[in-house]
C-alpha cells in the first residue's frame, strides 16, 4: 500500500525537547513498519479522511477512515504488521510502546503534499488487543477568505447581497474541525 499512495513525512512530537523527538523519530525509522505507518496515514489523507482508527482482532488489525463523518473500512493488516505499526506510531508520539492496556494520548506531525497537519493519537487496550485513534487536522485552515473558496463572481455578489440584508437567517455548515 505504501508504494501506491503519495508519501508523507512523519514528524515526532510529544517529547520534552527536540533532541528526544529526533531520537524517537530515528528509532521509529529503523522499523520496517515505518513505511506502513506512513502509508496508512497517506491513504487516509488521500481519501480526505480526518480520523483513522486501527482496531485489533485476534488475527488482524482493522483499518477505518472517517471521511466527512462516515467511517469507511479499508483492507486490514495482519496482526504482526499492525503491532509493529502501533509501535512506530507510539514511538513518534513519545508513548510507552510496551503498554497495550492503559489509555495513552500523544501527538505527532505529518507533511502531505506540502501541507502540514497536527495529529493526535489515543491508544486504549481492548479485549482483543489495542485500539488506536488518530485525529488529523491541518495546521492552518484551507480557506481564509471568501475568495479562497473559488466562488464565481456572480455567486459571490448574490451571497454578499444576502449577507447585507437587515432581516433573515443564514445557516452555514462545515465539516468537523473546519469552522
Predicted features, each with a name:
Residues 170:
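Conserved beta-strand position immediately N-terminal to the Walker
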Residues 179:
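Conserved glycine(s) of the Walker
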Residues 1-154, 164-165, 173-175:
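N-terminal, intrinsically disordered, highly charged
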Amino acid at each position: 500500500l505504501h508504494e501506491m499512495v503519495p508519501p508523507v513525512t512523519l514528524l515526532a512530537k510529544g517529547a520534552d525537547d527536540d533532541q528526544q523527538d529526533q531520537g524517537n523519530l530515528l528509532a521509529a525509522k529503523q522499523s520496517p513498519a515505518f513505511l506502513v505507518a506512513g502509508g496508512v496515514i497517506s491513504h487516509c489523507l488521500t481519501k480526505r479522511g480526518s480520523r483513522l482508527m486501527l482496531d485489533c482482532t485476534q488475527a488482524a488489525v482493522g483499518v477505518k477512515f472517517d471521511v466527512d463523518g462516515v467511517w469507511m473500512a479499508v483492507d486490514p493488516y495482519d496482526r504482526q504488521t499492525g503491532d509493529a505499526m502501533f509501535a512506530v506510531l507510539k514511538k513518534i508520539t513519545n508513548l510507552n510502546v510496551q503498554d497495550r492496556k492503559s489509555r495513552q494520548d500523544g501527538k505527532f506531525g505529518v507533511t502531505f503534499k506540502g501541507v502540514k497537519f497536527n495529529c493526535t493519537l489515543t491508544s486504549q487496550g481492548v479485549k482483543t488487543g489495542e485500539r488506536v485513534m488518530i485525529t488529523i487536522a491541518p495546521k492552518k485552515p484551507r480557506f481564509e477568505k471568501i475568495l479562497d473558496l473559488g466562488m464565481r463572481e456572480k455567486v459571490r455578489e448574490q451571497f454578499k447581497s444576502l449577507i447585507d440584508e437587515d432581516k433573515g437567517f443564514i445557516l452555514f455548515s462545515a465539516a468537523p474541525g473546519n469552522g
